């Protein structure tokens, strides 16, 4: 009786078979499992542009090239080309800018839910884990194939990136209207707080990328982390917290609560969800 194949081989065989079969079949999450969090300070051999103008976004949003020509509906996964930098013969720019970013997008539940709600807005998921990024890319590719001819899900994309290090390499000043930070790693130990995705330094980068009037959405099931994020955003001169009435009137809040994988897990476990929204205010005159 032969030995059972190791899980890594099963995952590899599954991904190879996906490239040879119907692209409209949704990927199975069990073949893309990875540890819950990654160390943002490690060298992950990431590929990133020197500046936003060098990024070729047409690989991730093929329906929105500058020239008005629809490119083949394809997403380059990490087994092929993690990221393409524009060369002199191809601008790599889009008809419109990315306006919504989900930092640490996980398995892409929020991206997929937002796509039909804001079909004319480009949204991007940033995820540091390789297998999870590949899953989201495959899921987007399958959803586009299932909805061919409708334009659905053409407005979302996902790349592997370390948001704590390279956010300004991808995004221009005042480019974004929304930033989502959903169920981030709480890093409970005090010596690990420097790895939290919300800090005075990182909030300045969010303020750089977010236009005046833009919103940062935060949600967590860890109350001390919720308090930490609120304190750091309120203390930053570029942000003000929205009132509870404003939060309840924002349709994205309910989506954020119910459509992320972590949000569903908290609901199943009957846990609490702590939400806070922060508005980017105008810079003072210099």
From Swiss-Prot:
Any Gene Ontology CC annotation: nucleus
Effect of deleting the gene: Significant reduction in pathogenicity on the host plants. Mutants develop penetration hyphae into cellophane, suggesting that appressoria of the mutants retain basic function for penetration. However, they fail to develop intracellular penetration hyphae into epidermis of the host plants.
Cross-referenced InterPro entries: SAM-dependent_MTases_sf, Trm8_euk, tRNA_(Gua-N-7)_MeTrfase_Trmb
Residues annotated for S-adenosyl-L-methionine binding in this entry: 104, 127-128, 162-163, 182, 260-262
Keywords: Methyltransferase, Nucleus, RNA-binding, S-adenosyl-L-methionine, Transferase, tRNA processing, tRNA-binding
Catalytic activity: guanosine(46) in tRNA + S-adenosyl-L-methionine = N(7)-methylguanosine(46) in tRNA + S-adenosyl-L-homocysteine
Class in the EC hierarchy, top level: transferase
Record localization: Nucleus
Catalytic center residues: 185
Region (Disordered), start-end ranges: 1-22
EC identifiers of the protein: 2.1.1.33
Superkingdom of the source species: Eukaryota
Pathway the protein acts in: tRNA modification; N(7)-methylguanine-tRNA biosynthesis
GO MF term set: tRNA (guanine(46)-N7)-methyltransferase activity; tRNA binding
Subunit text: Forms a complex with TRM82.
Reported function: Catalyzes the formation of N(7)-methylguanine at position 46 (m7G46) in tRNA.
Protein family membership: Belongs to the class I-like SAM-binding methyltransferase superfamily. TrmB family.
PANTHER family: 3-DEOXY-D-MANNO-OCTULOSONIC-ACID TRANSFERASE/TRNA GUANINE-N 7 - -METHYLTRANSFERASE (PTHR23417), TRNA (GUANINE-N(7)-)-METHYLTRANSFERASE (PTHR23417:SF16)
Protein name: tRNA (guanine-N(7)-)-methyltransferase
Protein's organism: Colletotrichum orbiculare (strain 104-T / ATCC 96160 / CBS 514.97 / LARS 414 / MAFF 240422) (Cucumber anthracnose fungus)
Lineage, highest ranks first: Eukaryota, Fungi, Dikarya, Ascomycota, Pezizomycotina
């Amino acid at each position: 009786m032969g030995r059972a194949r190791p899980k890594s081989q099963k995952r590899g065989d599954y991904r190879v078979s996906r490239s040879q079969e119907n692209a409209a079949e949704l990927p199975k999450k069990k073949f893309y499992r990875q540890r819950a969090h990654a160390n943002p300070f490690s060298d992950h051999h990431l590929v990133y542009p020197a500046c936003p103008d060098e990024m070729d976004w047409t690989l991730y949003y093929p329906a929105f090239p500058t020239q008005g020509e629809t490119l083949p509906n394809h997403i380059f996964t990490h087994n092929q080309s993690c990221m393409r930098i524009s060369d002199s013969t191809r601008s790599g720019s889009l008809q419109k800018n990315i306006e919504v970013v989900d930092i640490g997008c996980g398995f892409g539940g929020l991206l997929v839910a937002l796509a039909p709600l804001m079909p004319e807005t480009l949204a991007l998921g940033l995820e540091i884990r390789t297998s999870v990024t590949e899953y989201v890319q495959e899921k987007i590719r399958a959803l586009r194939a299932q909805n061919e001819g409708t334009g659905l899900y053409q407005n979302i994309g996902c790349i592997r990136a370390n948001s704590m290090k390279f956010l300004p390499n991808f995004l221009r000043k005042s480019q974004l209207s929304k930033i989502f930070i959903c169920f981030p790693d709480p890093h409970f130990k005090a010596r690990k707080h420097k790895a939290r995705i919300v800090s005075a330094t990182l909030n300045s980068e969010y303020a750089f990328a977010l236009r005046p009037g833009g919103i940062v959405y935060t949600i967590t099931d860890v109350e001390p982390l919720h308090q930490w994020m609120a304190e750091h955003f309120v203390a930053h001169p570029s942000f003000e917290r929205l009132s509870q009435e404003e939060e309840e009137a924002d349709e994205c809040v309910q989506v954020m609560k119910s459509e992320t994988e972590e949000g569903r897990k908290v609901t199943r476990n009957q846990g609490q969800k702590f939400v806070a929204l922060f508005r980017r205010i105008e810079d003072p005159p210099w």
